Amino acid sequence: MQELSWKTICGYFPKRNRNSHKGTFGTLLCITGSNRMPGACALSTLAALRSGAGLVKVATTERNLPILASQIYEAVYLPMQTTKIGEICWEKNAVVLQSALKQASAVLIGCGLGNTAATQELLRNVVNLVECPLIMDADGLNALASCIDIMQKQKPNWILTPHPGEMARLSGTTTAAVQANRPQCAAEFCKQFSGTLVLKGAGTIIQQGTTAIQNPTGNPGMSRGGSGDVLAGMIAAFAAQGLSPYDAACAGAYLHGLAGDFAAARYSEQAMLPQDLLHCLPEVFLKLEQERTAKEQ
């Protein structure tokens, strides 16, 4: 299988126009985080901000707001009412979410939401309303796997980012079967799925239709809870900025892995954390900008 290259990724990011503003780089709506998992919300939000989205709106539980707002100053927060167990529910937040969905350039749903009926209802309603690229991760994927009727409403601008376990649930098979033949699993799924699939793992596969490519960056130190939240935020930010779903997925996978490689070199594979990827993203994008400048000279 062909591999992504640094040259290809650099081509996705032209020089920013001096006469630009935050609207130029898109509005990303993140529907993320239950009371139990504010960290997933924080990681995906910071990743989106570090990846250049013009405006990041975060729909998360009221209890999460003091935690997030005291650490992440650049996001706009939409406080969500919750179920008794602290998960976002559609019914209590429909008016706010409907308005936010209309204004979004891309939507990320799933990170830290919780795998319950409330999340399934939330996803079902978002799918019915969203027109822009929709990135589904984590519990968004678990909700999708539990609601076949949602999958029947699929659109070409959907991006799914499953790890092998989530892929198994989406495909109705086992994790072992997915890992035994990852390229075939991705190809078979995309015969029925019209969007872009990002099958995470060693050699992440990005597939859309019959087009597939593998990511060469990344390392075992990234095998920690939270790394996927960073990836989801990056892909969503690129989609909000106008990259096609496939290109956004390719850029996200490659640059996420590169940040992981930088983090491993700095902190070691053993000790590195997902938040260290965020610390390394400026270095990643600086490398990209320096490469672009060198070509222009």
Predicted regions and their residues:
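Small-residue (G/A/S/T)-rich helix-start motifs and N-terminal tracts that mark the onset
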Residues: 1-133, 142-159, 164-297
